Amino acid sequence: MDYFPEPTLPDESGSVWDETMVEWLTRSTHPRARAVREFINRSLSCFPPKYADSLSKKLHDNFQSHLFELIVGRYLQVLGAEIEPEPLGTNNTRIDFRATFSDGVIASVECVSKQFNQEAQRTMARHENMARVLDDAGPTKWAIEFRRLPEARSPDEFEPYVDKARSFYASLPEPIADGPPPIFAWEGDRGQMELEAIPFPKGTKANHFGPVVTFMDNSIERLRYALKDFQKRKQAIGAVPPVFLAIDCPFNGPDSEDFDQALFGQTVDHRDMHSGKSLGITFNPNGLFVTDKGIPFAGVLAFLKLSMVGAADPVLYLNPYQRWKLPAALASHETRVWTSGIKMTAATREPTINLLRFVEYN
């Protein structure tokens, strides 16, 4: 069944300003859109029909969060588990999956897809919108670096800047390799735009890039919040143990060091204030898995560097205060646990995450 059917009219244009993923998938016949629909439809077809239909509707309402649920469910299946979606718990809550593995061991898994560094993400999305609009204006033989972009939040607000950029692009001479880069700046109602044209004589299409977005990373804070979430804890308490929290970690989200710090604690390198030489390294065990013995999760399954085109193999972080027999398919992942420090055990299996056959397109 095609839960995301092919559009009836051809439209290979890219996504437009503030268009949602679902809106784009509904109208676009671009090869990438076709590939995304194929991945989703194929993945949904692996689930029981009732659950697949329900998850499809959820994807239309909140694509990113429920895409992660789809990926986790499929990954459990790839690991050899038979899954029961949304089983009723002893306290009338429902966990995302109860998984029975090939060795007979049962585990429950709850998924969480947090939005990390949201303000920075909004800024980068706005920059991407402006870059797409300016790509339509050219030029082809110059690479345009955004040194500064305005605070435009709609196509109408950005249109005066586009008009000025077109005039600037039209004034550019034939590029000379290693020639001086022309610079353009214009102040409008939504702030200043600064562009630098870098000679690129062999270019065949418009190329815009930058600016760098700086921000204070809140990944550790958001990871801790996921473990403190009252509803998630309630779901875990009502589920068949051991219960694992699967966390979505996109490229712009937390890495393994963020998880180490959030769950176990922080390694501190003490240095002499004058010479800068190290005086010794200590470990501050202030992570939630160490300080909060009431956490009902047996561990966290971190899906690192996850996107629709691939991912790193998940890493299993174990709660040091819970001792359960683990399914062999989970225990064979790279695991980390706190003893007197962070103990890491390498994976004993080949990576399997890409057996999901993520989105592929030319």
Where are these regions (language model features)?
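Nucleic acid-processing catalytic cores of prokaryotic defense/repair systems
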Residues: S56-K57, G73-G80, V240
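Histidine/cysteine-enriched polar flanking segments
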Residues: R42-P48, S102, A107, S340-A347, ...
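Charge-dense, extended regions
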Residues: G287-N362
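Elongated alpha-helical scaffolds
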Residues: Q64-G73, V78, A107
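Metal-dependent nuclease catalytic core centered on acidic motifs
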Residues: S28, K114-F297
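Interdomain/boundary linker segments immediately adjacent to catalytic/signaling cores
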Residues: M1-H66, E119-Y161
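Short acidic loop-to-beta-strand element that houses the catalytic metal-binding Asp/Glu
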Residues: L76, E86, N91-C111
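An acidic, charge-biased composition feature
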Residues: M1-D11, T29, A120, G253, ...
